[in-house]
Amino acid sequence: MDKPHITLIGMGLIGSSIGHALKRGDLASHITGYARSATTREKALSIGFVDSIADSLQQAVADADIVFLNVPVGMIADIVKDMAASLKPGVLITDVGSVKKSVMNAVDAYLPENATFIPAHPIAGTELSGPEAGFAELFDNR
């Protein structure tokens, strides 16, 4: 099986750590990053845990095989709604939210039938935040 094209939506501690872990394990053919802040996008690219950045959510997910939603739970509904039409058939989507009922409601309301959603939670973190805070080892032994 070919390595997947992965998109990270949100590149704070968890998103950047996922990117670092994917890079360390050589697990993706390409990693695209997206955040609302242009500063965060540029930092992510310069740090190197993504291969490219997208200027829009729709552009970020268009070629993705897997999409990680690394954003606060309260933002997931709007993100899923905004990206739904741009998802390619067969895409797998997962989240890192701490609760699932509102996430599942958003997914049920907006995600197209040709996409698969796997709810998740990394059960990891630190007191730090932002793209500079991420590190591949955050998920080791978890």
Regions found by a protein language model. Name each.
Residues 28, 88-91, 113-115:
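A short helix->loop->beta-strand "cap" motif at the edges of active sites that frequently abuts
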